[in-house]
Amino acid sequence: MSKDLISTDEYIKIKKKRKRIKKIVVLFIFLISILVTLCLKIPYFNIESIEIKGNVNIPKEIIKDSSTIKTGNNIFYTNKKDAIENISLNPYIEEVKITKKLPNKLEIYVKEREALFYNKVDKDFFIISKNGCLLEKRKEIKNMKLINLQGFEFNESKIGSALKAKDERGVKILNDFGVLLKNNASDVIFTQLDLRNLLDIRIYSNGICVKIGTSDQIEKKLNTAINILKRDELKKAKKGYVDVSYEGNPVFYIEK
């Protein structure tokens, strides 16, 4: 009998405890709901400033406008995914990150693609990034200091995408060259890269043809060629070649 009474008492206590917990949970949810509603409604969380970082050539206003985020919008309503997708539609944008700085600031960081190559098709210049992305078509390239590129299906390529090539290895080789040429700190200026034959790759410095051969050890071959091209007799040369395509001592020839 006493055991049954004790069990009943314990049951009542447990039931009361559960009711208290339930009330606390309901109250907590209610308070959270009020807090969320306030955050979404009060002006304290309205965006006051949008800071653009990382842009070099693309104006800040273009990035802001393409994001479709406006000052005055509630920071919690801001859809970062949509904004990133909108900004990334610009072919010159390689990467986008958006950070919310509570209570009312937004930071948009962009990494731009850099134009390095070009090819002329009919009256249009195709502008290409260092990693082989077609950035735009334009009518002139004055003062852009780009390298002429050969060996791709330019007319079949789409703006914002990698160049089309008959041999897919071409894009990878172009990317390798792009990194090396962008980091070239010497005074040697390259004017054309010919990837039409991947077994006989050639790069030109004005009238001097550098025979690279295959894509093996591109960095070593290019550095060797640069050191040769820095020699006085080659700086003055108008036509000739430097052959670094094979193992052993490189050969150069200056046309008289």
From Swiss-Prot:
Keywords: Cell cycle, Cell division, Cell membrane, Membrane, Transmembrane, Transmembrane helix. One of its GO terms (cellular component) is plasma membrane. GO terms for biological process: FtsZ-dependent cytokinesis. The chain crosses the membrane at residues 24-44. It is found in: Cell membrane. Residues 45-113 form the POTRA domain. InterPro entries: Cell_div_FtsQ/DivIB_C, DivIB, FtsQ_DivIB, POTRA, POTRA_FtsQ_type. Pfam families: FtsQ_DivIB_C, POTRA_1. Residues 1-23 are cytoplasmic. Residues 45-256 are extracellular. It is a single-pass type II membrane protein. The keyword Transmembrane applies. Belongs to the FtsQ/DivIB family. DivIB subfamily. PANTHER family: CELL DIVISION PROTEIN DIVIB (PTHR37820), CELL DIVISION PROTEIN FTSQ (PTHR37820:SF1). Cell division protein that may be involved in stabilizing or promoting the assembly of the division complex. This is Cell division protein DivIB. It comes from Clostridium botulinum (strain Loch Maree / Type A3). The gene is divIB.
